[in-house]
Design a protein with these regions (language model features):
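N-terminal secretory signal peptides and thylakoid transit peptides that target proteins
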Residues: 1-14, 18, 22-25
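N-terminal "domain-start" segment that seeds a small globular fold
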Residues: 25-49
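Short loop/turn microsegments at loop-to-beta-strand junctions
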Residues: 34-35, 57, 134-135
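Short, ordered coil/turn segments that flank beta-strands lining enzyme active or ligand-binding pockets
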Residues: 42, 52, 142
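Short active-site neighborhood of thiol/selenol oxidoreductases, capturing the structured segment around
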Residues: 49-67
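Hydrophobic beta-strand core positions in alpha/beta domains
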Residues: 58-60, 92-94, 138-139
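Structural microenvironment flanking redox-active thiols in thiol-disulfide oxidoreductases
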Residues: 70-110, 120-126
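Thiol/disulfide oxidoreductase modules built on the thioredoxin-like
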Residues: 108-113, 120-164
């Protein structure tokens, strides 16, 4: 095949890959400000993104019906326990299709030590980029900028290195 023809045939694939990689968490683009959001937590209180200014924090969109979400939860707990005394926090947002009673039961049974919020209306998932795949996890820096978006289970060793750099 001629080099020019090969280039023309591969160009659409390269464009698609360049567009899709950031969406899939395959590479980091410039940090952007986290959307201003209000999280209604299980105890009925609320937190906002402004409450986390000055902290490094993890935002995890998950569901009790998501096997990957359930499997990664012990590592999210471990990460929270490891860094929470150093200016780190975590918010786990249950998707709108997750029955609140299931979320409450899950959080109580596993003793989740961090903020667990309900997204009853789907507004949070929409505000954070029309989240539909779970788990989807964001790492936010002390200035409130999204520094990483991960679709699927994070590489927790790499995530810990990133958290260490940001703290």
């Amino acid at each position: 095949m001629k080099p020019r023809r090969l280039l023309l045939k591969s160009l659409p694939l390269c464009v698609c890959a360049a567009w899709a990689l950031p969406l899939l968490g395959g590479c980091d683009s410039a940090a952007q400000a986290a959307p201003q959001s209000r999280f209604v937590v299980l105890d009925g209180s609320s937190k906002t993104t402004a409450d986390f200014k000055g902290k490094v924090w993890l935002l995890n969109f998950w569901a009790t019906s998501c096997t990957t979400c359930v499997a990664e939860m012990p590592e999210i707990i471990s990460t929270y326990n490891k860094y929470q005394g150093r200016g780190y926090d975590t918010v786990a947002v249950a998707m709108s299709y997750d029955p609140p009673s299931y979320v409450v039961n899950f959080a109580q049974q596993r003793g989740l030590p961090f903020w667990v919020a309900l997204d009853n209306t789907g507004e949070l998932a929409k505000a954070w980029g029309d989240i539909s795949a779970t788990p989807t996890t964001f790492l936010i820096d002390k200035q409130g900028r999204i520094v990483k978006r991960i679709v699927g289970k994070p590489d927790f060793a790499a995530l810990h290195l990133e958290i260490e750099k940001l703290l």
